[in-house]
Amino acid sequence: MSGKANASKKNAQQLKRNPKRKKDNEEVVLSENKVRNTVKKNKNHLKDLSSEGQTKHTNLKHGKTAASKRKTWQPLSKSTRDHLQTMMESVIMTILSNSIKEKEEIQYHLNFLKKRLLQQCETLKVPPKKMEDLTNVSSLLNMERARDKANEEGLALLQEEIDKMVETTELMTGNIQSLKNKIQILASEVEEEEERVKQMHQINSSGVLSLPELSQKTLKAPTLQKEILALIPNQNALLKDLDILHNSSQMKSMSTFIEEAYKKLDAS
């Protein structure tokens, strides 16, 4: 015991004399602690792995029934893997486009995950039905894009038709306004014309026209009919012919037609 005490005293004296050696010893102690911690972690990890192995073993028991079906499974096609790669790259670019911290570490981590996933997809086998769904993704995407394009074109045509209808409506509104202005102008012109007619005929308050009186000479003058008959030698025969023509059915129908026409004109 005295030898161990002397050795510890010597070590203490050496550490006091050489502080650098003291630092090295402290680092050694820290490294030993790290090793112990890692060993403990590895032990726990092994326990977890053993539990996971047990669960996997039970899952394999349940999956033995589907082993015959797995024989028909097929690996993923190259086009599907390429499509998956492009999708992942676009997602990575979208994530990295945002202003985030530690961008390089995130990029490295995402690229590593992408690489791991693509490596798994190279050996992955899927059922034929799922394979058809995966291979039809690009065609379905193209169909949806074509449908979206058709919808956009239809919307553009509808917008053009709406613009044309709006333009025609504006033109019709302008025409209606111009017609209203013309009607107002015509109404004012009609009022002015009525005023002129009133001034010309000098209509009094009773509504009777104040026309100039006819002279006695004009009243005693022969009528135009008498003057015309005086020029015809056989007046009686002409009067009979005129009477027959006046009482004929053609003349009566013509007179009724003229009366109806006048009635319609008066009604309008």
Curated annotation (Swiss-Prot):
Family: Belongs to the CENP-Q/OKP1 family.
Gene behind the chain: CENPQ
Keyword Coiled coil: yes
Principal subcellular localization: nucleus
Subunit structure and binding partners: Component of the CENPA-CAD complex, composed of CENPI, CENPK, CENPL, CENPO, CENPP, CENPQ, CENPR and CENPS. The CENPA-CAD complex interacts with the CENPA-NAC complex, at least composed of CENPA, CENPC, CENPH, CENPM, CENPN, CENPT and CENPU.
The name this protein goes by in its record: Centromere protein Q
Coiled coil: 170-206
InterPro entries reported in the protein's UniProt record: CAD_CENP-Q
Task of the protein: Component of the CENPA-CAD (nucleosome distal) complex, a complex recruited to centromeres which is involved in assembly of kinetochore proteins, mitotic progression and chromosome segregation. May be involved in incorporation of newly synthesized CENPA into centromeres via its interaction with the CENPA-NAC complex. Plays an important role in chromosome congression and in the recruitment of CENP-O complex (which comprises CENPO, CENPP, CENPQ and CENPU), CENPE and PLK1 to the kinetochores.
Species of origin: Homo sapiens
PANTHER family: CENTROMERE PROTEIN Q
Coiled coil as UniProt keyword: yes
